[in-house]
Amino acid sequence: MNVVTGFDFPDAGRVELEGREITSWPAHRRGRAGLVRTFQHGHLFRGLTVRENVEVAALGAGAGPGAARRRAGELLGLLGLAAQAERPAAILPHGDERKLGVARALATNPRFVLMDEPAAGLHEAEVPEFAAVVRAVRDDHDAGVLLIDHNVGLIMEVCDRIHVLDQGRTLAQGTPDEIRQNLDVTTAYLGVSVATEEVVEEMTDDD
């Protein structure tokens, strides 16, 4: 995630955005090109209100003050945060922090949104609601989504293609159905091959 978004630079290989090499680009240039991210631990402007957090992102993307305020209102309504608009970001519940991170990303009119473990710290009851947020980014805002997470249910529900890593190495890649049937994935998930049926059952609970 850090390498793709320009917070770190690779020792080898290259990063491309829609066929154009951007390996040497700093993070702010990648952001202007439409490649934005959310963070695992918020990175909110905690001294600002919820609305101001989104306005700042829109202003940074070139919107005027009035347009930024309107955009913030639209996005907070979309993500169910309108009632929290004037609250300090510092006192938001964890799930709402995640939504605010997505709202800030969308305020920049991105082409791609990268989400770093967005389900970390969420209660299981909050995951389906956040899955709807991810789908809205893709379907309503026409932005591609790259999502990294350990929550199998979220991954299976929202991803069209899945790339599974084990100890930093590619273990499998494919559609959710292909991953469900991959014995290497189920073995790595629990660490024992006899656990395959249990893992497949967990992966398919929501089907």
Feature names for model-found ranges:
Residues 1-207:
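Glycine-rich phosphate-binding loops of nucleotide-dependent enzymes
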